[in-house]
A protein has these predicted regions:
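Hydrophobic faces of well-ordered beta-strands that scaffold small-molecule active sites
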Residues: 27-33, 56-60, 84-90, 114-115, ...
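N-terminal capping/lid subdomain adjacent to the active-site entrance of alpha/beta enzymes
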Residues: 1-86, 91-100, 104-108, 231-266
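Shared catalytic-loop signature of beta/alpha-barrel
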Residues: 104, 110, 121-248
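Active-site-adjacent beta->alpha loops and helix N-cap segments on the catalytic face
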Residues: 38-41, 64-80, 95-99, 118-131, ...
Length: 266
């Protein structure tokens, strides 16, 4: 009943025409400039290139060495300015106590969210981090396989941003309950999309969540150009956001030429 009420209420504010829907640009962020191992010069070049393309949200990897992390965050923050957004992802590398300590050192860079700072199954560990730093945002979800784990994270207030993975979870039938749970608790959903075909999947989920489920003001999704040239209808990015797809289907049909080229028998 609650789910039906959420959807029925949201349907009242649907776009009045397909033209309104088709002109929607869904905001995205890029990790293209922030991978570990990049030199300062390469990071600077890539950040400047992405700024020129209209990107306003940047994510970078951290976790190898905190002093290097501080240096990299300072570099990127100075390049993007104070109006653009910066996020960090440590890919589960820190313990809970290390996370608490390191967040204290990175706060100065006005981080929008800290992604997967520790073990992605540790609901209570995330809660301990939140209790230590109630003023920061934690994000996780790309390793979560089902709606029950998301329910536990959200109900315990252990995360601030819900990062569903369209392939990790068992189909859209399991994803929709997660979107509805997040909506009930007013938790933003920012899908994970680093992986072949993930951007093509999530562009549809973003619009379903925006127009039919969520009432949250924050709209954002990850983008990574992962082998998009092999898809018949790849996700299109303009001015730092997803252009609404207009072709039918889930956009993940691989080109016959690519299948033939990379087929095991060939």
């Amino acid at each position: 009943d609650e789910a039906a009420k959420i959807i029925d209420q949201k349907k009242l504010s649907l776009p009045s025409s397909l033209d309104d829907l088709n002109t929607t640009i869904f905001p995205a962020y890029t990790t293209a400039a922030g991978w570990l191992g990049y030199s300062d010069e390469k990071m600077k070049r890539l950040v400047e290139e992405n700024l020129s393309k209209g990107w306003t949200h940047f994510k970078m990897k951290v976790g190898q060495d905190i002093e290097r992390d501080i240096h990299r965050c300072k570099l990127v923050r100075e390049l993007i300015g104070n109006k653009n957004k910066l996020m960090v992802d440590s890919n589960q590398i820190w313990s809970v106590n290390e996370t608490i300590e390191n967040i204290g050192k990175l706060k100065q860079f006005d981080i929008l969210f800290y992604e997967e700072p520790t073990n992605p199954d540790d609901v209570l560990g995330f809660k301990k981090i939140k209790d230590a730093h109630p003023d920061v945002n934690l994000a996780t979800g790309e390793m979560i396989q089902n709606k029950v784990m998301f329910k536990q994270f959200i109900e315990h207030k252990s995360l601030d941003y819900c990062q569903i993975d369209s392939c990790r979870i068992a189909s859209i039938n399991e994803i929709l309950p997660v979107l509805l749970i997040a909506s009930k608790f007013n938790t933003p959903v920012i899908p994970h999309a680093v992986g072949v075909g993930l951007c093509e999947y999530v562009q549809h989920l973003n619009l379903i969540n925006k127009f039919i489920i969520s009432n949250h003001d924050l709209l954002l999704s990850e983008y990574a150009e992962s082998c998009s040239e092999h898809f018949e209808n790849p996700a299109i990015i303009r001015d730092g956001g997803y252009v609404t797809p207009t072709n039918p289907g889930y956009s993940v049909k691989i080109k016959d030429s690519s299948l033939n080229e990379f087929d095991y028998n060939n």
